[in-house]
Amino acid sequence: MAQVQFYGTGRRKNAIARVRLVPGEGRIIVNNRPLNEYFGQKILEMLVRQPLEVTDMAGRFDVLARVEGGGTTGQAGAIRLGIARALLQADGDLRPVLKRNGFLTRDPRMKERRKYGLKKARKAPQFSKR
């Protein structure tokens, strides 16, 4: 018999996460490594776990995530959005809870491009009056 799986895609900055929820005991695997081994920072682990804890689904599903691009913060945010969308697929009644906590909103902030004549996106070279 085929196992029930739920999918969700999350993006944040330049990171893209493809998340699969499989019935299990609450393991979170990111790119074939356990969550704490992959990120190493407690704050990022908490960020990833938030949707599961708010909806009381922490022990019901194993999370299998493939994430690429971006840095650690962007990847954690992308996984969080992917988990939230997959949970919504699993149980539509969770929408108000997830929406209230802001887990279904894609963060639109991106790195601003560098402009010519400037050192960074907005940092100008030192101005000399004379």
Swiss-Prot record:
What's one GO-annotated cellular component? cytosolic small ribosomal subunit
Pfam families for the chain:
Ribosomal_S9 (PF00380)
Domain of life per record: Bacteria
Q: Does the keyword Coiled coil apply?
A: no
Molecular function (Gene Ontology), one example: structural constituent of ribosome
GO BP field: translation
Q: Where is this region: Disordered?
A: 104-130
Q: Which UniProt keywords apply?
A: Ribonucleoprotein, Ribosomal protein
SUPFAM superfamilies to which the protein is assigned, alphabetical: Ribosomal protein S5 domain 2-like
According to the UniProt entry, which residue ranges have a biased composition of type Basic residues? 111-130
Does the keyword field hold Ribosomal protein? yes
Cross-referenced InterPro entries: Ribosomal_Su5_D2-typ_SF, Ribosomal_uS9, Ribosomal_uS9_bac/plastid, Ribosomal_uS9_CS, Ribsml_uS5_D2-typ_fold_subgr
The Swiss-Prot or TrEMBL record describes its family as follows: Belongs to the universal ribosomal protein uS9 family.
State the protein's name: Small ribosomal subunit protein uS9
- Species source reads Moorella thermoacetica (strain ATCC 39073 / JCM 9320)
